């Protein structure tokens, strides 16, 4: 009888632990896709982002219009800024590097990596500590005269910020991911 009681107790503990673990796991992620601006990203809690017009200063000092998709919550924010740069080459790593230089001014870099999103698509990823203690995760890429800048500022270790920054996806005009699974070789 004691064996049965112990098995029943152990089963109850295991089932409770399993139920608790399930409640602690993030739910399914649904990517927000914007076909007009050709990107996708996972915003926290599947919210539709707010949209605002902004400007971007190019590597040559010109100010050009940009569109920003964003979510702000107490103590954290998430943005994707998309800049169209039609008067230059379709891919210009100098724009990516200049963007990284500007973001690096916001805090202390803990990770600064240059690589390709996919062959021929230059990119950078940054992981920084901001003066307010938040972690700033950023990635930037250029493709087809479009500069994509994803930034997430949140308390250190926030799952939503990591998922947001890592989920940025460049889309073709039909909404398909440009990442063809060929790996991410170093960019020249």
Residue ranges and their predicted role:
Residues 26-36, 55, 177:
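Short acidic/polar N-terminal linker immediately downstream of export determinants
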Residues 1-11:
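Bacterial N-terminal signal peptides that target proteins for export
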Residues 35, 47-50, 95-108, 145-188:
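Surface-exposed amphipathic alpha-helical segments
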Residues 28, 37-39, 43-45, 76-78, ...:
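Envelope-exposed proteins and targeting segments
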Residues 66-95, 149:
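A short acidic-to-branched-hydrophobic micro-motif
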Residues 16-18:
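N-terminal signal peptide c-region/cleavage motif recognized by signal peptidases
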Residues 40-69, 97-143:
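Signature of long, low-cysteine stretches enriched in small and polar/charged residues
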């Amino acid at each position: 009888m004691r064996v049965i009681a112990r098995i029943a107790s152990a089963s109850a503990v295991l089932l409770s632990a399993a139920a608790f673990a399930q409640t602690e796991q993030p739910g399914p992620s649904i990517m927000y896709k914007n076909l007009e601006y050709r990107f996708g990203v996972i915003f926290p809690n599947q919210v539709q982002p707010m949209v605002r017009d902004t400007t971007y200063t190019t590597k040559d000092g010109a100010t050009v219009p940009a569109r920003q998709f964003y979510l702000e919550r107490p103590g954290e924010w998430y943005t994707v800024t998309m800049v169209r740069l039609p008067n230059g080459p379709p891919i210009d790593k100098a724009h990516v590097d200049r963007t990284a230089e500007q973001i690096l001014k916001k805090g202390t870099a803990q990770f600064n990596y240059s690589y390709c999103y996919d062959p021929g698509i230059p990119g950078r990823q940054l992981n920084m500590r901001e003066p307010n203690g938040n972690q700033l995760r950023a990635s930037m890429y250029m493709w087809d005269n479009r500069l994509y800048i994803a930034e997430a500022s949140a308390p250190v270790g926030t799952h939503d910020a990591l998922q947001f920054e890592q989920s940025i996806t460049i889309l073709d005009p039909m909404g398909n991911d440009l990442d063809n699974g060929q790996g991410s070789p170093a960019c020249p």
